[in-house]
Design a protein with these regions (language model features):
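All-alpha prenyltransferase/terpene-synthase fold signal
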Residues: 1-323
Length: 323
């Protein structure tokens, strides 16, 4: 059985060895640029680890792992256009480097590349794998639409927000672990349980992202307070609004939209309100709740506990971050 570091290396090597045609250059160069951009490789790692719970042959999962990474990067290309984001992983985003039309078309080609990779799975599993992938892909689009809808919606509830991030973030993790489990020979029941594991893990991961954006360690290089400056409806903002009295809610609205405030002043004012309302602690409680639920589900799988240890270790490493 490979270590997690060896699995990640195998995924990186597989992606690096993937060849794209030289022409048309403006179609394929952005794909290679995007896939070589690094990142956590979270989704392909979850897929291969899930396969490894049920099978010692995790190499069989590499094409599907590359497929979910390709799909993830397709969503990033289009997300960056919708968000007008000029930077991705410390480098110019594809649309900033090559233009919007190129980014759209290269993203579409990356999606097709993902399907091509998936078509290599064993024929007896192909219908189930494609069904899982298609459901996952459509739900990610639904989540993105809800996220855009929230920008125009004056009030968003915690329930609505959790539903949105489940679709936008968690279902891609869930689809990845289910496909990996299928390739490893898991039962339908174990696939269902792993899906729930990944949903809970994804919710914990996204809530932690929300928290770290405002309370991460700035010494580690990431700017703090980006969500506040953008006025994004995060778990922190929504929780603050739901716990505040009307006077405090108005203070929060004013802090978000006051053009006279500098960036540092805006971040400071909003965080002081969060602190007063105990929002960081409430968020940490929800993160811990979701993460503990995820780990407890691993205990219910029909395999020896030793088979899930690498998945457990990886999940714990994801949540042990400061930025």
């Amino acid at each position: 059985m490979q270590t997690n570091e060896q699995m990640l290396s195998a995924i990186e090597n597989y992606l690096a060895q993937t060849e794209f045609p030289a022409e048309p250059e403006l179609l394929y160069a952005p794909i290679g640029y995007s896939l070589a951009g690094g990142g956590k490789r979270l989704r392909p790692m979850l897929l291969t680890l899930s396969c490894g719970i049920f099978s010692d042959d995790v190499k069989q999962a590499l094409p599907a792992a590359a497929a979910v990474e390709g799909f993830h990067n397709f969503t990033l290309l289009h997300d960056d256009i919708m968000d007008n984001a000029a930077v991705r992983r410390g480098k110019p985003s594809v649309h900033a480097k090559w233009g919007q039309n190129v980014a759209i078309l290269s993203g579409d080609a990356m999606m097709i590349y993902a399907y091509r990779l998936l078509s290599s799975v064993p024929a007896n599993l192909l219908p189930q794998v494609l069904s899982t992938f298609n459901t996952m892909a459509l739900e990610v689009c639904e989540g993105q639409q809800y996220d855009m809808d929230f920008e125009q919606k004056p009030k968003v509830s915690v329930v609505e927000y959790m539903h949105m991030i489940e679709l936008k973030t968690s279902v891609l993790l869930a689809g990845s672990v289910v496909i990996g489990a299928m390739l490893g020979g898991a039962s339908d029941e174990d696939c269902r349980r792993l899906r729930r594991f990944a949903v809970e893990l994804g919710l914990a991961f996204q809530l932690q992202d929300d928290l770290l954006d405002s309370y991460g360690d700035q010494r580690l290089g990431k700017a703090i307070g980006g969500d506040i400056l953008e006025g994004k409806k995060t778990y922190l903002m929504i929780t603050a609004m739901s716990h505040a009295d009307e006077a405090t809610r108005e203070m929060l609205r004013t802090a978000y939209r006051d053009p006279a405030l500098s960036d540092a002043e805006k971040i400071g004012k909003v965080k002081s309100i969060y602190d007063r309302l105990d929002v960081p602690r409430l968020t940490e409680q929800q993160i811990q709740l979701r993460f503990e639920r995820a780990l407890s589900i691993l205990d219910t799988l029909s395999v020896a506990p030793s088979r899930t240890q690498r998945m457990r270790d990886y999940a714990m490493s994801l949540m042990d971050r400061k930025n």
